[in-house]
Amino acid sequence: MNLMPRYRQVADNFAIEDRPSKVAAPQLLLWNDSLAKAFNINVVPELRASTFSGNEQQAIAAVALGYSGHQFGHFSPRLGDGRAHLLGAVEDAQNQLWDIQLKGSGATPYSRGGDGRCALGPAIREYIMSEAMQALGIKTTRCLAVVGSGETVYRNPPQPGAIVTRLASSHIRVGSFQYLATQGDVAGLKNLADLAIERHYPKIQATGPERYLAFLAAVIKNQVELVVSWMRVGFIHGVMNTDNTLVSGETIDYGPCAMMNSFDFDTVFSSIDKQGRYAFGNQPNIANWNCARLAESLIPLVNDDDEQAVALMTPIIDGFAEQFNVEFSAMWATKLGLAGTDTADKELIAELLQLLKEHQLDYTNTFDALTESLTGGMSIPEVLVQWAGKWQKRTDDRSYTVMRAANPRVIPRNHVIEKILSEYNKTGSSELLHEFMQVMHTPYENTDKLAKFQDAPSSDKEYYTFCGT
């Protein structure tokens, strides 16, 4: 495993050198063998637990990164990696660098009094969700390993501790730029923006202010595409703070996330999102808002005069809504296999969504049924039969293939994950987890054990998600 240092060149106080804290009895619980092979991570089995617990990393100059964040709209100027250590980066087969980070590896200078640890349940949840999202075709951070610490993490209630090994194409967040902007560190901002462009947007060849305007536009494009992909499968992030918004356009932080069952744009599962700020249907607005916060941070790189900088960036920010509407309409067209375009399509889609909400139909299973109905494989829900007569006139012989690629047959449902975690906690068995991950590996295909994980819960009104911190 060849680790390459990064981030230290950005600013003096951006990446603080720190080392993981040793744990009592590391035990490898989950290992992502295909991911390890993709990155040529050749750690022998007997050393994996000690390596990815942090116990073998004492000689490596790991770092904790600083960042700020708007958390539920309230600004915190100093957050940072309070329980994570960035070891460096590894190269994939395309020679692209990916950060490798330990999460739950002990307190850092950014811990703000926290213990720096992670409980086992949230660690397993991150493993399941990140790999499920990858299989669903959604840009995401990845999970290489989960290592039990052999120690108790004092949450409510006390739980076994664990360390997650996370891979990401970078950990550069909107909050990373806010952190340097708050300090007035223009040189650091430029270094960070140039690093982000180098890693994620190398096609940007412009110089001067145009370079950073192009960067902002590229981030917006990726955020639009990311949120549309979330909504295609019913994913609700739950904590879309600016510190959880990567400029790469990858999904990060699966703590309070959930999947929508019955369709409703107002769906919220997070226990702390009392106002529905991060509801399913509000995710585009929040992504737009977060991009505006990035733009504010980039002002010194665009023009010395704030008003002129804002004038240059405002049209780019305002373009988010139009881009989203185009991509969102295209998403519904693929989910319904609509042939060509028709002025009545908007009304057709709106009618379907109203029926889904009114009859509390399951989002995933309804679109699966519509897809399979084109080949006679499944019947359409009775309440949709009249609507389906109009829809079928808009399909053609290519519709099934288009719909099958857009509509998963299985998703990481909330109650399924809870069942997996419950079984693991009670018996220590990962059999159900591996069985589910095998099915989830091909979520758009019909596999042997698919039906076991397809059923929607009778109700999830009392289901709440929590941050694992």
Curated annotation (Swiss-Prot):
InterPro entries registered for this protein in UniProt: SelO
Record GO terms (molecular function): AMPylase activity; ATP binding; magnesium ion binding
The keyword Lipid biosynthesis is assigned to this record: no
Binding site for Mg(2+): 244, 253
Enzyme Commission number: 2.7.7.-, 2.7.7.108
Keyword terms, alphabetized: ATP-binding, Magnesium, Manganese, Metal-binding, Nucleotide-binding, Nucleotidyltransferase, Transferase
Signal peptide start-end: none
Cofactor: Mg(2+); Mn(2+)
Domain of life, per lineage: Bacteria
Keyword Metal-binding: yes
Catalytic activity: L-seryl-[protein] + ATP = 3-O-(5'-adenylyl)-L-seryl-[protein] + diphosphate; L-threonyl-[protein] + ATP = 3-O-(5'-adenylyl)-L-threonyl-[protein] + diphosphate; L-tyrosyl-[protein] + ATP = O-(5'-adenylyl)-L-tyrosyl-[protein] + diphosphate; L-histidyl-[protein] + UTP = N(tele)-(5'-uridylyl)-L-histidyl-[protein] + diphosphate
Binding residues annotated for ATP, in chain numbering: 80, 82-83, 103, 115-116, 166, 173, 253
Active site per database record: 243 (proton acceptor)
Xref: NCBIfam families: PRK00029.1
PANTHER family: PROTEIN ADENYLYLTRANSFERASE SELO, MITOCHONDRIAL (PTHR32057:SF14)
Function: Nucleotidyltransferase involved in the post-translational modification of proteins. It can catalyze the addition of adenosine monophosphate (AMP) or uridine monophosphate (UMP) to a protein, resulting in modifications known as AMPylation and UMPylation.
Family membership noted in the UniProt record: Belongs to the SELO family.
Name the UniProt record assigns to this protein: Protein nucleotidyltransferase YdiU
Lineage: Bacteria, Pseudomonadati, Pseudomonadota, Gammaproteobacteria, Alteromonadales
Gene this chain is encoded by: ydiU
